[in-house]
């Protein structure tokens, strides 16, 4: 079975007895409450930056453990607006270097690049996939002014070593929390550990909207105020524009959805952790490299590695198991980052060459997971 065939099977679900993700089923469990709140919002007069957005910002900031949250259009905008705000405040300057994970989704890097800053790739740890602080320190120059840690796949990327590194070198510490909503204990959650954090509420995320959405969290009132203004065309007061801003605002409908889902986020993350624990305990295939858990994890994705990835995926697909790859092409091999094409990043390339994501979500049943585990253990060469 070709890679294209695997994708078609996943997209139409019907040919896969275990889909990678059934969003309809995930959202069905919220349906009665969502129908009520969406009807209520639709009958109102203010659909942009109204009472639902204000309430969600308060509730989300409280859940994360920061004093402030600003709703924006999506996760990319959240990160981009953080950089734009720091530039406007003079805490960053055009051309400054920002350390970023070499192993991440392209959005992290593009947000830096499109802000007029210079992203510098840092190799990950091969076992956790997270940026290695010891590698980061070797990339520091006099132009390095910020560092972005991505809580990749749902695992907390920041520990005391990271905090010490940022403090020692006076770096802005920015979190990409797109994949780790609710990760960590209260008071230690991702999104509250750095100077500012970007959050995504894309529908597939642990806290997913019914469309696009994002947020910035911080304890810095000046930064939050500027992010809010920049996301509203650079305006604080109607028809008065203090900065050349953008259009990036969380709407009332999505905020209402997120308020409903936020109430169950911790419980949903516990279910993800239960599913992940079973995978870790019961997958015994010696050809499968299981993920290493070094810190708190909420399992946005359950990512294994296999030396013969495509053959393994095809064999699983033949048994009705849908899988995906996050991500097949490393950022430094993308045309959009042609200036990185000569970078030597062997750990990143090894990870991107071998990773496979198994189904893991709140709609996955115990029976479906049993079938996945059985298939994974059977497919050996």
Which role does the model predict for each range below?
Residues 103-109:
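Conserved coil-to-alpha-helix start sites within the AMP-binding
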Residues 32, 92, 272:
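Pyridoxal 5′-phosphate
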Residues 13, 24, 53-58, 63-70, ...:
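PLP-dependent aminotransferase class I/II
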Residues 3, 7-46, 51, 359:
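N-terminal "arm"/small-domain region of PLP-dependent enzymes with the aminotransferase-like
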Residues 115, 168-169, 319:
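Helix C-cap/helix->beta junction micro-motif
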């Amino acid at each position: 079975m070709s890679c294209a065939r695997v994708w078609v099977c996943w997209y139409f679900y019907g040919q896969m007895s275990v889909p990678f993700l059934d969003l309809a089923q995930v959202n069905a469990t919220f349906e009665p409450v969502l129908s009520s709140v969406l009807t209520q919002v639709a009958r109102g007069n203010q659909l942009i930056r109204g009472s639902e957005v204000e309430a969600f910002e308060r509730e989300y900031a409280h859940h994360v453990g920061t004093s402030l949250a600003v709703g924006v259009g999506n996760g990319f905008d959240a990160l981009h607006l953080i950089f734009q705000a720091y530039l406007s405040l003079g805490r960053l300057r055009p051309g400054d270097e920002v350390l970023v994970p070499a192993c991440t989704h392209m959005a992290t890097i593009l947000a830096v690049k499109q802000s007029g800053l210079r992203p510098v790739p840092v190799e990950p740890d091969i076992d956790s996939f997270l940026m290695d602080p010891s590698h980061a320190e070797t990339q520091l120059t006099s132009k390095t002014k910020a560092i972005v840690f991505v809580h990749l796949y749902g695992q907390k990327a920041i520990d005391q070593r990271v905090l010490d590194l940022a403090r020692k070198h006076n770096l802005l510490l920015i979190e990409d929390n797109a994949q780790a909503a609710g990760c960590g204990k209260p008071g230690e959650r991702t999104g509250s550990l750095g100077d500012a954090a970007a959050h995504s509420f894309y529908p597939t995320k642990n806290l997913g909207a019914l469309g696009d959405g994002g947020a910035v969290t911080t304890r810095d009132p000046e930064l939050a105020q500027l992010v809010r203004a920049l996301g509203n065309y650079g305006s604080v007061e109607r028809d008065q524009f203090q900065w050349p801003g953008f259009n990036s605002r969380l709407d009332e409908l999505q905020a209402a959805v997120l308020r409903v889902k936020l109430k169950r986020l911790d419980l949903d993350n516990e279910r993800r952790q239960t599913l992940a624990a079973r995978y870790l305990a019961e997958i015994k295939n010696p050809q499968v490299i299981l993920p290493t858990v070094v810190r708190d994890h909420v399992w946005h994705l359950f990512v294994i590695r296999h030396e013969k990835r495509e053959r393994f995926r095809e064999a699983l697909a033949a048994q009705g198991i849908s899988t995906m790859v996050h991500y097949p092409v490393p950022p430094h091999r993308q045309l959009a980052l042609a200036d990185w094409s000569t970078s030597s990043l062997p750990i990143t390339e090894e990870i991107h060459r071998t990773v496979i994501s198994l189904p893991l979500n709140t709609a996955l049943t115990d029976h479906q997971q049993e079938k996945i585990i059985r298939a994974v253990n059977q497919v050996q060469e």
